[in-house]
Amino acid sequence: MHLTLQSVYPAIIIIFFLYKKIKRSIGYQPLKPRWLFTRIILFSLFAFGLSIFSAIHPFLYGYLILGILGGWLLVFFAKKNISFEKRRGKIYFRTHIWVEVILLTLFLSRFLYRVTELYLTSPDLNRLGSYSQSIGTDPLTIGVCFLIAVYYIGFSSFIIKLSRNELEQHEYNKEKDILAR
């Protein structure tokens, strides 16, 4: 195995985006309903694509069901442990640190596993269909990806719903303060 610029540049870009993802997901995040709605759409399309792919390998539906159950379990736990904070007129939110750690660990472990597997088996990728067959033999990656997709769809939907109520309550309190003066 030798390192070339062809493999170093993508690795640097991937590491940069992983760093941004980790930094953004730990701690308070600004409440941006438009971004949350975009996240719902993207993860819904991703989950739909995984569901379609599972039609080729029907045994993967079991892993998708486990991903759904795990994702909803994390959403349920995150709903119970969400906290909001107001700074300089903006609303920030965060969920429990263990939910964030579980998601990051699952994502990073499966991501690194798949990248390592692809790097080690790169000569086999010249054959048509070998990548699809390698995914079919590793259903845990699909289950984990579906778990993450279900979590982000459910949690983002919950935050959007909660933020509407929070913003309405905030506007009501503002009007009440103005009338009290």
From Swiss-Prot:
The keyword Transmembrane helix applies. Keywords: Cell membrane, Membrane, Sporulation, Transmembrane, Transmembrane helix. One of its GO terms (biological process) is sporulation resulting in formation of a cellular spore. It is found in: Cell membrane. It comes from the Bacteria. It is a multi-pass membrane protein. The keyword Nuclease does not apply. Induction: Transcription is activated at hour 4 of sporulation, requires sigma-K and is repressed by GerE. Maximal expression depends on SpoIIID. GO terms for cellular component: plasma membrane. The chain crosses the membrane at residues 5-22, 35-57, 61-78, 91-113, 140-162. This is Protein csk22. It comes from Bacillus subtilis (strain 168). The lineage of its organism: Bacteria, Bacillati, Bacillota, Bacilli, Bacillales.
